[in-house]
A protein has these predicted regions:
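N-terminal catalytic cores of NTP/NDP-binding nucleotidyl/phosphoryl-transfer enzymes
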Residues: 6-68
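A short acidic, often aromatic-flanked loop/helix-cap motif at beta-alpha or helix-coil junctions
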Residues: 9-12, 91-94, 151-155
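Phosphate/ribose-recognition catalytic cores of enzymes acting on nucleotide-derived substrates
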Residues: 13, 191-310
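Residue-level signal for inorganic ion chemistry
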Residues: 25, 76, 114, 174, ...
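Residues at the starts of beta-strands that form the adenosine-phosphate
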Residues: 42-46, 82-83, 112, 143
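N-terminal Rossmann-like or analogous alpha/beta NTP/dinucleotide-binding catalytic cores
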Residues: 56-118, 122-139
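Glycine-rich, Lys/Arg-enriched anion-binding loops that position phosphate/diphosphate groups
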Residues: 137-238
Length: 310
């Protein structure tokens, strides 16, 4: 997937999906796929999304993102988006709503079709809404499609709802709404060698900066190593109080991994379901026994969910 350059507007007519798209949940995907569908009409599907969260820049949110920028771009490409346009929010945050649409969406992007969610706002202080966008699109002869809210069990599907689910440990429902698995990729670092007690290595990882933090506890997970192999994992997200930890880390045991040294490699960890809260055990033996029991549950969840879908 390529980053859209301003000069391209002279030769390309586009279908533009507007939004920040944190998590690319069910509702977001309806927006994205509406733009992708316009390929049949000869339009190039483009996603307009800021490089930084506007809420974070404005100090309105500090609960973290549902996916990294890298994951977002990979997912957009898998959905059929061919180009992204990701300007610095700080450079456009004081632009009026009218100028934003006329200069950026119609001007730079040459949009002939625009799609956004029902609650999309734009321009300085978020002054623009879908009513204004419709007016401007009508005046320009540009088609506008506004996606109505996606609902699940009576709740409007939103990034805010999913962040709450993640913080509560309700990863199973969060994954359902995300249409993917919440997780992260990070370098494997040295830990306290707990894996030696368990018979196979554990992998220690720092969570990516600004990622939403799940409820502290043990999760069934799916771990993909650099060689492409996927293993069932038992992941502890928290501070590891039994071994005197104080810093937030992810530590994952892969009971079926026997592949040797993997420190320094990057592993992708996807959380499948919550097993139990983090607990301080009286000794390492109790911790080892608990993790061994958790592995039985994790394998059942892995076989149910990861191999056959969310």
């Amino acid at each position: 997937m390529q980053n859209f350059t301003v000069s391209e507007h002279e030769k390309l007519n586009t279908a533009v999906a507007l939004g920040f798209f944190d998590g690319l949940h069910k509702g977001h995907r309806r927006v994205i796929l509406s733009a992708v569908e316009q390929k049949k009409n000869g339009l190039l599907p483009v996603c307009f999304t800021f490089a930084q969260s506007p809420k974070e820049v404005l100090g309105k949110s500090s609960k973290g993102a549902l996916m990294t920028t890298e994951d977002k771009l990979k997912t957009l490409e898998s959905l059929g988006i061919e180009h992204t346009f990701s300007p610095d929010f700080k450079k456009l945050m004081n632009m009026s709503a009218k100028d934003f649409v006329e200069k950026i969406i119609f001007g730079n992007l040459n949009a002939k079709f625009v799609v956004c969610g029902f609650n999309y706002h734009f321009g300085k202080n978020g002054e623009g809404d879908t009513d204004l966008l419709k007016k401007l699109c009508d005046e320009n002869g540009t088609e506008l499609k506004v996606i109505e809210p996606e609902r699940d069990d009576g709740d409007v599907v939103s990034s805010t709802l999913i962040r709450s689910l993640v913080s509560e440990g309700n990863i199973r429902r969060a994954n359902k709404l995300l249409c993917s698995y919440f997780g992260f990729s990070a370098v494997i670092t040295h830990g306290k060698r707990l894996g030696r007690e368990l018979g196979t290595p554990t992998i220690n990882q720092k969570l990516p900066e600004n990622l939403a933090v799940p409820k502290y506890g043990v999760y069934a997970s799916a771990v993909t190593l650099e060689n492409g192999k996927v293993y069932c994992g038992v992941s502890n997200i928290g501070v590891k109080p039994t071994v005197g930890g104080t810093k937030l880390l992810s530590e994952t045991w892969m009971p079926d991994f026997h592949g040797g040294e993997i420190y320094g490699q990057t592993a992708d960890v996807r959380l499948l379901d919550f097993i139990r809260p983090e607990k301080k055990f009286d000794n390492i033996t109790e911790l080892k026994n608990a993790i061994t029991d958790n592995a039985v549950t994790a394998k059942e969840i892995f076989d149910e969910m990861y191999r056959y879908g969310v």
